[in-house]
Amino acid sequence: MELFDTHTHLESFARRGDLPAVLERARQAGVATMVTIGTGPDDWELYRGLAAEHAGDGFVRHTVGLHPCSVDSAWEAAVAGIEARWKLEPRPVALGECGLDRFHLPKEPEEAARIFGWQQAAFAAQLAIARRLDAPVVVHSRGAFAECVAMIDASGVDWRRVVFHCFTEGAAEIGELNRRGGVGSFTGILTYKTAEAVRAAALAQGLERFMLETDAPYLTPMPHRGKPNEPAFVRHTAEFAAGLFGVSPAELARVSTENARRFLGI
């Protein structure tokens, strides 16, 4: 069974000093490829280095982007460095994660409005870069689904190159993405007892567009919820999703891996 974790954050494991063990556990669990997701200039070169180390088998791929929670008054300098990363080898497989996040805004209204304005400007700038590069876009949307959709509509980005990672909206919202050509990808939240709306969204989108992710070290699937997440645990989400779609785990792994490779063009 060959699994593809489309969204993880390996920086946390590198900082902790246990990245080699985490990668080995992922291999043992059947993970053939993982994409470590850039959030800002501090992790871009680390991730390019990891992708270079694994260039032979493509086990680790990487993206470059400025996460909305990394946006501050200096966002323009960070975003200005993104496009040049596509001239380096190995090249990023997507731009992101980028988007909008209302959840982590400060409580003070004026400060929140100022930061959200920076997020919108940084997102628009990154969408423009993605359009120029014809790169896939990994979108972070939390408490700002309608705004993210509207900004992508206005950007001219090809919706077929857009994934809303860690999809937590419902069937109606994923329908908004799908009718435009975009997709959502799913984390261990899918396994949570209270996540009926997320499961409904996955079913509404269908197996033919389903992609898996861990978002490690966050959002650990059952039965390990409460512990730090890691790429190996994508297997638990895959097995749960197989039951949801009424297929074997091997078939779920095959289709979701094909979907991920097709979306990223690898």
Model region roles, listed by residue range:
Residues M1-I266:
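Mid-domain alpha/beta scaffold segments of enzyme catalytic cores
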